[in-house]
Amino acid sequence: MSIATEPGTTDTASPSAFRVATGAVVVTTASVLPVFLTGALSVQLSRDLAFDPSGLGLVVALYFGVSALCSLPVGVVVERVGSRVTSRIAVVGAAVLMAALALGARSYVALVVLLLCGAWCNVMGQLSSNLTLARSVPAHRMGLSFGVKQAAIPAATLLAGLAVPAVALTVGWRCAYGIGALLALAALFACPRTDARPAARTGSGDRATAALAVIGAASGLAAGTATALGIFLVASAVDRGIDPGLAGLMLTLGSVVGLSVRMLHGWLADMRSGGHVAVVAGSLAAGAGGFLLLAVPGTPALVVGVVLAFGLGWAWPGLLQFAVVRLNPSAPAAATSIVQVGVYAGGFAGPIVFGSLATHAGFPAAWTVNAVVMLVSAALMLVGRRMLLAHARRRTESGRRLSGS
């Protein structure tokens, strides 16, 4: 896959790569925390607000469905306004959302309405962080930076998992949302202080929109299965007889593994000259085995399945976003928003399908279907890679013709 040579600025006056990456992690974690906290608290929420696994799947699905609708327009806004302002808007919005959930979620309908009203916060937080990294981090550190940034997703599930035994089972789920709101406000201190200058503009034909759309579709399938993992793991473990506190710790274990592997993916990406999308496809194929193990009875299978599913089946987003940004340095937020449409669409459909399967056929059947879907996403990712390679060849040949004229 062809990559751009100057995706980030190397201005010596710019903040350090470490500080930029840390800020991106904090902003992304705060932005995505509301939905994953809802999944981790699902046992307590369902008891108080009277809904079943399909109801949980519906609320999460609608959340990501609204996110999919917001992705492209929010991407345009982030490109025009800059990450300094939009990152602050995102974390304040997430804080307001969690405070509203703590105080106003008195019924299932109220839970749904509140989450949908705040879905745009996740989109803006993700895209503003992508823009910050693309314009502030040197090219030779960008892979690791995106790996660190995407570690925010398992970091959010880590916080959500810890909230179950530490808060939800002691003082209640409303306090867990309240603490989440305070943490989101604290994220304001990590937001970027300035907007880095954009890279030089390239022609619109350089964006490889068709290839990005195919990769977005593959990402949608993978994201649908991965979203179900973060949302339904605790409920699934409790259903097989695991103590709720231990089930929350299983989510924590998976989050730590996923966080570590995402950073490893990024570090290794900086040492390669290409092949990033192929690595994503291989990770998805291997992660399918972890989902199959989640369908197998017994605690050992659960532990190994959690490690594989989080470590391989859900460790690819940072590497994929890195590849997309390298290909589209002049409009990183807009380019990643194309892929994010697929990701959010998968987040919309995945929980609905999984929740329905879990309700009518049981969790083992739902995890098995997830494994098959992840294999299909790996194959589609390879198709998108072939399209990217073909686009890169056409662009190279066009450049040669222009230089020879």
Regions found by a protein language model. Give the residues of each.
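Residue-level signature of mid-helix packing/kink "hotspots" within the transmembrane helices
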Residues: 36, 64-72, 157-158, 255-263, ...
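Conserved MFS/SLC helix-loop-helix module at the cytosolic interface between two early adjacent transmembrane helices
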Residues: 69-105
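Helix-to-loop junctions at the C-terminal end of transmembrane segments
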Residues: 70-82, 261-274
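Helix-loop-helix hairpin linking two adjacent transmembrane segments in secondary transporters
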Residues: 110, 148-192
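Cytoplasmic helix-loop-helix junction between adjacent transmembrane helices
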Residues: 114-152
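C-terminal transmembrane helical hairpin of 12-TM major facilitator-type secondary transporters
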Residues: 275-320
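A late C-terminal transmembrane helix in Major Facilitator Superfamily
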Residues: 330-363, 370
